[in-house]
Each structure stands twice: as structure tokens, then as C-alpha cells.
Regions:
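The catalytic core of metal-dependent phosphodiesterases that act on cyclic dinucleotides
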Residues: 66-177
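Short, well-ordered helical secondary-structure segments
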Residues: 37-39, 158, 188
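General structural signal for secondary-structure boundaries
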Residues: 6, 53, 130-133, 179-181
Length: 206
């Protein structure tokens, strides 16, 4: 489960910018929902990818969410430079039991990010720019503990092709959010709606 791919597109929906949904530079998007609903409800106990920024990486994550650390994968990108201050912070988070992932790295960035990549559990690769066969050889030799994830998958056809090729552990992109209209079924209300209603009813101000 990934909060990164669940984010709203503010270019297409500019009105969302006025909701204060992501206010607070040190607040990490997604942790409040994990704290409120629990990992079992959100992802059936599986790992959850949570994006962090070059500022929120220094936040007290445990204070924002007390979920099991090993179930939370903190996702960084190339806006976090591979300098000592950030490498040390990533080491601290790793020692606390959190898992780490990185995305938006070009092949030319790999060498500069060597110390960062040593700490990563996952790396999200742009499947349109990086050949998986070469990536498997590179990471297999230098970073054998990293699991490869295919990113930026737009269509179900691309997903099926990449799955057939193999080499990736996870797949991320728009493909799984496209509605499939084959057949008909009844969809149960989202459990989160019940939790929200219960919280409102139990509120002292209700």
C-alpha cells in the first residue's frame, strides 16, 4: 500500500490547495490515517509506503504514529541530497526499525547516492528509462539487499508485460486505479467511514 500513489493531483484539482490538507512542513502525510485506522485496516497488515520530504525526515515519527516500525516504509526521493546530515538521519531511522525506499533516481545518480542506497530496502525504478535486466545485475552486485520496484506504470498492459519479464517485487503507477467494468458486484462501505462516524458520535462536542 502506498500513500504516494494515493495523493491528489493539485494541477488538475487546484481547489484542493485551499483545504490545508498537507499543511505543516514536519507533518508526514499518511501517518495520521495509519494512526487513526491501523495498518490491519488499511493494508491487511502489509507494509505501507509513506513519502517524506527533506524537512519532514527530521520529524519525530513515533510521536505522529505508534504503528509497528517494520510495517512503515519511508519513501524519499532525489530532493534529499546524499550528504552527511541526511545519511546520518536515515541511519537513525533504520536503527529505529523503519524500512526505507527511494525513487526518482536517474542512472547517473546511482554512484553519488551510494551511501544512501546502502541503507535502502526498496528502490523504485522508472520502467520506461531503466532496463530491468541491467538493473538486476547492477543492484544484485552492489546492493543485494535492495528489492526492485517498477514505477510509473500507466496501463494494465504495461503491468502485465513487466510482470512477465520479472525482476520486480512491487509495481506502482496509475494502472491499478483505472476502473475495471467487467461484471457486477456489491461493494461494501469503506470501513474507514464507520470509524470516522464513530469518532464523531463519541466526540464530547457531538
Amino acid at each position: 500500500y502506498s500513500f504516494f500513489t494515493q495523493r491528489e493531483n493539485y494541477l488538475l484539482n487546484p481547489l484542493l490547495l485551499g483545504t490545508a490538507q498537507f499543511d505543516g512542513a514536519s507533518q508526514i502525510t499518511g501517518l495520521e490515517l495509519i494512526q487513526k485506522m491501523g495498518i490491519d485496516t488499511l493494508s491487511q497488515g502489509k507494509e505501507i509506503f509513506v513519502p517524506i520530504t527533506n524537512i519532514s525526515i527530521f520529524a519525530d515519527i513515533t510521536e505522529q504514529c505508534d504503528a509497528p516500525h517494520e510495517k512503515i516504509v519511508l519513501l524519499i526521493d532525489n530532493t534529499i541530497p546524499p550528504i552527511e546530515m541526511y545519511v546520518n538521519r536515515l541511519k537513525e531511522l533504520k536503527q529505529q526499525g523503519y524500512k526505507l525506499a527511494i525513487r526518482k533516481l536517474a542512472v547517473s545518480d546511482f554512484e553519488n547516492y551510494r551511501e544512501v542506497l546502502k541503507l535502502m530496502d526498496y528502490v523504485l525504478l522508472n520502467n520506461r528509462k531503466i532496463a530491468i535486466d541491467k538493473a538486476k545485475i547492477y543492484f544484485g552486485k552492489l546492493f543485494p539487499n535492495i528489492s526492485l520496484c517498477a514505477g510509473n506504470i500507466d496501463t494494465m498492459e504495461d503491468f502485465e508485460r513487466l510482470k512477465e519479464t520479472g525482476g520486480y517485487r512491487f509495481y506502482e503507477g496509475k494502472f491499478y486505479r483505472v476502473p475495471i467494468t467487467k461484471g457486477q458486484t456489491d461493494v461494501a462501505p469503506l470501513k474507514g467511514n464507520y470509524i470516522d462516524l464513530l469518532n464523531i458520535v463519541n466526540s464530547p462536542d457531538f
